């Protein structure tokens, strides 16, 4: 089997297959984070059979591909938890067509809290020694895990030691490349990092009543 994957309206292959009635994407087109997986005979010249993964948007496409990854034995935690990946000589497909549902919760994710005590130190000392900080290489692994868990939302580390997320430009690019929506938590009202960006000696107390 070949695997053909792409997003409706963004992938030439997927749009061609739909225009030739090889696949019917009407059920998911325009939806939020949906995907379809279908076994297609003779999808394009030279390929007798293919598994086609079509997503309604970027995350839908990713979820479809990663659902196949999970089905063949790759745990979403393969990297973070050293979950072993069982090697298989052959993988079989049991269904001809599958269409996912729209997630019942629109935004699903995590907040990296109190990273000073663990994740920041590990990243600085082991994974991003050259940067000496919690940066894009670490965020790439976090974002990959989120996609593999079919999540889409991340409130980043924000302590003074690990810096505000946007202070390292590559962080934003990494999050966007994984189609992860970035949010903010208690230390970042209005996307301003009070833990590291508010300078009391120059800006005064963080107190609206007395320091407007």
What are these regions (language model features)?
Residues 1-102:
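Contiguous, structured surface segment used for ligand recognition
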Residues 7-16, 104-212:
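Aromatic-lined carbohydrate-binding surfaces of glycoside hydrolases
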